[in-house]
């Protein structure tokens, strides 16, 4: 994921929250961002060679059970990370928490069309799109068909929203559907997506069911 100077989002926020939960984390930065809660000014991508070297440096550490990918500077960067994870940690669950647009409205992957986003989604085990990302990635596909076709579990955040509650729904490749409801807390704030994805990843890494992990993730941002 990206490094944000305010530490309110990105891998700094991820690690801080994961360690509060009791996890041991390693990180591979993908970009250095210039942003705060109100404005995104830009980002500088980490090179392919630097990402590869970071994976090499981590080989002496314990293997992860889950890898969560957040901000990527390009879809090729996502493919590079997935390739390294599959090579070194074949039993690891890969979660992609896509960040296509910042909360301040900046498009992060402006050249990625629906087809290329779908190909990228098919390279991970679990996808965590919010409402905007669902429309950009799924296109005309239903989540049920996409999950089966890509062999990817799709957790659609905020699939239903009332004044009192918000519902998340997971679509599994085998056709199973998992729902999770929580009290509505208003509009998303800067960094809340990081907390949700990190909490979900933590509980899955420790063997929790997807239903439990989704419920815990909702509580983390409530």
Where are these regions (language model features)?
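N-terminal phosphate-binding or glycine-rich loops at protein starts, especially the Walker A/P-loop
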Residues: 1-19
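Charged C-terminal helix
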Residues: 42-45, 211-222
């Amino acid at each position: 994921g990206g490094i944000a100077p305010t530490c309110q989002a990105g891998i700094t926020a991820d690690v801080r929250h994961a360690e509060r939960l009791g996890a041991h984390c390693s990180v591979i930065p993908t970009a250095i961002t210039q942003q705060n809660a109100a404005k995104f000014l830009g980002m500088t991508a980490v090179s392919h060679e630097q990402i590869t070297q970071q994976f090499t440096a981590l080989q002496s550490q314990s293997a992860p059970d889950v890898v969560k990918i957040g901000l990527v500077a390009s879809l090729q960067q996502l493919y590079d990370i997935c390739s390294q994870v599959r090579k070194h940690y074949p039993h690891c669950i890969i979660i992609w928490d896509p960040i296509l647009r910042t909360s301040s409205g900046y498009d992060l992957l402006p050249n990625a069309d629906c087809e290329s986003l779908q190909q990228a989604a098919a390279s991970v085990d679990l996808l965590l799109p919010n409402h905007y990302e669902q429309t950009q990635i799924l296109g005309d596909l239903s989540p049920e068909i996409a999950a089966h076709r890509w062999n990817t579990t799709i957790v659609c955040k905020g699939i239903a929203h009332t004044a009192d509650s918000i519902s998340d729904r997971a679509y599994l490749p085998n056709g199973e559907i998992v729902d999770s409801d929580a009290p509505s807390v208003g509009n998303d704030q800067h960094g809340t997506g990081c907390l949700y994805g990190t909490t979900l990843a933590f509980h899955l890494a420790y063997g929790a069911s997807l239903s439990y992990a989704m419920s815990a993730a909702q509580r983390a941002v409530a």
